[in-house]
Amino acid sequence: VTITDIAKASGVSKTTISRYLNGRFDLMSPETRRRIESVIDVSGYQPSTIARSLKNKRSLLLGIVVSDQSSPFSTAVLLGVGDALRNTEYVPVFVNCDDDPAKERYQISFLLSRGVDGLIVNTTSYENPFLVNLEARGVPVVLCDRYIKGHTFDIVTTDHDSTIRQLLAHLKEQGYGLPALFSQRWDNNSVRLQRRQAFAA
């Protein structure tokens, strides 16, 4: 079944079918939309993502890089990204780095070799010239949670400074005088650095 078959069965042009498949319902009447929808349901037609990506010169793949997939935080990121992309054309490609900067570079290079349209990265490194270079080359990169020293990427994160200060204030109100902070190494992790600095302030 092709787009031409759907157009003939619906009594409309291929342009109208293309508009329907691209969600441009504002360019057709409700009756036309229902008729096309019915024909597609009966025929079992599935548009070719590969053909569409070739036409638009996009892969419709989005690389999702997590630093440690065993972490509950990484699980939340993967679920959230999957939910956000569910009603879009994009297909997420997930990779794990095991908190290893060398593996992160390898995995990102792998994703780029597969032609992903962009990257969402929970980076392993506070100092990351590899990602900085990618952004300078025009690769769309959005950071998740951890930022990179000295560079302003688009980022989705938490206000860790404010969170720690609120936590300490709450503990003080509850009568706890000398709280302690236990952490993994923080020298190359922006989130841990922020928490430590807020704790020491």
Residues of each region from the PLM?
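N-terminal helix-turn-helix DNA-binding module of bacterial transcription factors
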Residues: 1-59
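N-terminal helix-turn-helix/winged-helix DNA-binding helices
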Residues: 1-2, 40-73, 77-79, 88, ...
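Short beta-strand segments enriched in small/hydrophobic residues
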Residues: 16-18, 54-69, 170, 177-185
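Short beta->alpha junction loops
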Residues: 94-101, 185
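Periplasmic-binding protein-like
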Residues: 115-123, 180-183
